[in-house]
């Protein structure tokens, strides 16, 4: 299926916060309670619609372990959006957000859209981080914020789509040079060509996560 734009996302955060589960819920609409630790980087893709235009999201799910941090850093380059995830039941995952954000700011393009997600809101009875704290962190650092549940699917769709809508608005506002793929945006059919007038006319073929 052809797309007007392709947006590249990266999902970052500590091990065990539910990054892979969020991706699986978004791409396959299912929850896998037992998930192997991500080794390096996993990949998923899905078509959505923004402003009546087909947008393909290409999503890189990264490992949270410190030993894979250098691999993760290489994926910041060329990402239009990032989902920064913590677990509302584990305080330390919230405390580590500043370190993840510093990495993202250092290695990504300055206009990358970052969505902060407090995952596992279905476990509110075990909450260790208040919603207000998440909101405050997002406000201080210029992030979008949502609490979500990869298990119940609450706000999962909304988080991915709101991030895409923000990126799309930046394109409309001329923030991105869409002819420069280092911004994590690729122009397909019906998208606004870059200043050079060039347009990537490729279409995505096949199904599954690699389509």
From Swiss-Prot:
InterPro entries: P-loop_NTPase, Rab_GTPases_membrane_traffic, Small_GTP-bd, Small_GTPase. Its main location: membrane. The modification N-acetylserine is found at residue 2. A motif (Effector region) lies at residues 35-43. GO terms for biological process: endoplasmic reticulum to Golgi vesicle-mediated transport; protein transport. The keyword Glycoprotein does not apply. It is a lipid-anchor. SUPFAM superfamilies: P-loop containing nucleoside triphosphate hydrolases (SSF52540). Gene3D superfamilies: P-loop containing nucleotide triphosphate hydrolases (3.40.50.300). Keywords: Acetylation, Cell membrane, GTP-binding, Lipoprotein, Membrane, Nucleotide-binding, Prenylation, Protein transport, Transport. GO terms for cellular component: plant-type vacuole; plasma membrane. GTP binds at residues 13-21, 61-65, 119-122, 149-151. It is found in: Cell membrane. A lipid is attached at residues 209-210 (S-geranylgeranyl cysteine). It comes from the Eukaryota. The keyword Zinc-finger does not apply. Intracellular vesicle trafficking and protein transport. This is Ras-related protein RABB1c. It comes from Arabidopsis thaliana (Mouse-ear cress). The lineage of its organism: Eukaryota, Viridiplantae, Streptophyta, Embryophyta, Tracheophyta.
């Amino acid at each position: 299926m052809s797309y007007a734009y392709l947006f590249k996302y990266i999902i970052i955060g500590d091990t065990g916060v539910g990054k892979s589960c969020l991706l699986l819920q978004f791409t396959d609409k299912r929850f896998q309670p037992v998930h192997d630790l991500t080794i390096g980087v996993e990949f998923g893709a899905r078509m959505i619609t923004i402003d009546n235009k087909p947008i393909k999201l290409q999503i890189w799910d990264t490992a949270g372990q410190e030993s894979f941090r250098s691999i993760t850093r290489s994926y910041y380059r060329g990402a239009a959006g990032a989902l920064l995830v913590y677990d509302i039941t584990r305080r330390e995952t919230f405390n580590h957000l500043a370190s993840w954000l510093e990495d993202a700011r250092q290695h990504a393009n300055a206009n990358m859209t970052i969505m902060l997600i407090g995952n596992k809101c279905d476990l509110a009875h075990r909450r260790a981080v208040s919603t207000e704290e998440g909101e405050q962190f997002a406000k201080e650092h210029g992030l979008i914020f949502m609490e979500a549940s990869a298990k119940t699917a609450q706000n999962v769709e909304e988080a991915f789509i709101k991030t895409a809508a923000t990126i799309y608005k930046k394109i409309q506002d001329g923030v991105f040079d869409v002819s420069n793929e280092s911004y994590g945006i690729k122009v397909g059919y019906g998208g606004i060509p870059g200043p050079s007038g060039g347009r990537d006319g490729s279409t995505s073929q096949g199904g599954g996560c690699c389509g």
